Regions:
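Intrinsically disordered, low-complexity acidic/Ser/Thr/Pro-rich linker and tail segments
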Residues: 1-99, 105-107, 230-246, 254
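Short C-terminal beta-strands that terminate individual repeats in beta-propeller domains
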Residues: 87-92, 128-134, 170-176, 196, ...
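Canonical WD40 repeat/beta-propeller blade segments in eukaryotic WD-repeat proteins
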Residues: 94-101, 137-144, 179-186, 221-250, ...
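Conserved loop/turn motif of beta-propeller repeat scaffolds
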Residues: 106, 148, 190, 232, ...
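Hydrophobic beta-strand positions that form the internal "hydrophobic ladder"
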Residues: 109, 151, 193, 256, ...
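Conserved strand-to-loop turn within each blade of WD40 beta-propeller repeats
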Residues: 112-115, 153-157, 196-199, 207, ...
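WD40-repeat beta-propellers
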Residues: 118-121, 154, 160-164, 202-206, ...
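Blade-level signature of beta-propeller repeat domains, shared across WD40, Kelch, NHL, RCC1
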Residues: 367-394
């Protein structure tokens, strides 16, 4: 595994085995050839680390751009590619950044911080565009609607708000929760949204009328994460006991996934309100996401990432455990996923790649959230920085 230490560097360790330091540093090509410099730096790195011959290192130094280093150990069938940030935004917030999202067009970012602020900024350079003011206390979660012009946020004040990204006005406020809102999900184009709260309830809201359409689940414990996904035709979501409101739009054939504090992962039919499954994990569930119409991921406080098949949820498809640090964010990405943890690690797992992509830079500070747009990946961290990675640099 790798524990990020500083900009573009990591401590790499395995249980009961020697630890070594890996650095991805800026290099000036000057008059040296790129191939020669790459070979020279790789040889120096191997000598410095005194690594076993079974460990192969290849370094790629891109002219004026971010660098990456690929480390593999064929003997252990393990391989990772370490990617340094393309750029870092340090002036968006003054304190820890707890959530972020990128608009559908990739032009704007939105983030919330423990400094009490929520801001919209230019995704290309971090330049501030709007400050969204109206929540009391901290904002726990924020995300763009599919249009990219509207933002949904939830705060410790138990309020859910909708904002215009164009003029920073709050156009809708939802009230009904009795505890702080910890996560949200948007149903299709956004006429309905879902919220999960410390009060133990998950609620469905009508954006057009600023009204609650119903309590989807009452868990009796904090709901740390929520996700909405379209169900595969083979999954029985049950039938609603009452005729759904005409204000429900796009809830049919949708599943709602709830990551609960009491070590349970719950799935219900969004329209039917009927249970689909209840899975008990090793610790509190912090986050969850759908990979497909029947596959999902959920991360726990003790570092486990469960992959489940909704058609047979009793036994996990697999359990990924890289460290005991809390899994804080999971995001479906291409044919795999991106995860971030409380020890500063962020990584990408892809089915078509035989290596893991490690996103470096966070100095052991928790990486709270990951967002993507095309080949760009953004992370937010306790150190108050937004980091942007370019997958084209690999």
């Amino acid at each position: 595994t790798a524990t990020p230490m500083a900009h573009g560097s990591s401590w790499c360790n395995a249980p009961c085995k020697p630890t070594f330091f890996l650095g991805v540093l800026p290099v000036s090509i000057c008059s040296l050839g790129a191939d020669f410099l790459s070979s020279l730096c790789t040889q120096a790195l191997i000598q410095f680390l005194s690594l076993p011959t079974s460990l192969l290192i290849s370094a790629m130094y891109l002219l004026g751009q971010t660098k990456s280093i690929h480390i593999s150990c064929p003997k252990e069938n393990a391989s990772s590619k370490f990617l340094a940030p393309y750029t870092t935004f340090s002036r968006i917030h003054a304190k820890s950044i707890t959530c972020l999202d990128i608009s559908s067009g990739g032009g704007l970012g939105v983030s919330s911080s423990t400094d009490g602020s929520m801001k919209i900024w230019q995704a290309s350079n971090g330049e501030l565009r709007r400050v969204l003011e109206g929540h009391v206390f901290d904002v726990n979660c924020c995300r763009f609607f599919p249009s990219g012009l509207v933002v949904l946020s939830g705060g410790m004040d138990a309020q859910l708000k909708i904002w215009s990204a164009e003029d920073a006005s709050c156009v809708v406020t939802f009230k009904g929760h009795k505890g702080g809102i910890l996560d949200t999900a948007i149903v299709e184009r956004g006429k309905n949204v879902v919220s999960g709260s410390r009060d133990g309830t998950a609620r469905l809201w009508d954006c057009g009328r600023s009204a609650c359409l119903g309590v989807i689940a009452d868990c009796g414990c904090s709901i740390n994460g929520v996700a909405v996904g379209a169900a595969d035709n083979s999954i029985n979501l049950g039938s609603p006991e009452q005729t759904p409101s005409e204000r429900e739009v796009g809830t049919e054939s949708k599943m709602l996934l709830l990551a609960r504090e009491d070590k349970k992962l719950q799935c219900v039919g969004l329209q039917s309100r009927q249970p689909v499954f209840l899975f008990i994990g090793s610790d509190a569930f912090n986050c969850c996401t759908f990979l497909s119409g029947f596959l999902l991921l959920a991360g726990t406080q003790d570092g486990n990432i469960y992959q489940l098949d909704v058609r047979n949820p009793r036994a996990p498809v697999q359990v990924i455990h890289r460290s005991g640090a809390p899994v804080l964010s999971l995001l479906s990405f291409r044919d795999g996923f991106i995860a971030s943890q409380g020890d500063g690690s962020s990584f990408i797992v892809q089915q078509d790649l035989d290596y893991v992509i490690e996103l470096t830079g966070a100095d052991c500070d928790p990486v709270y959230k990951v967002a993507t747009w095309e080949k760009q990946i953004y992370t937010c961290c306790r150190d108050g920085l937004v980091r942007r990675y370019q997958l084209s640099d690999l």
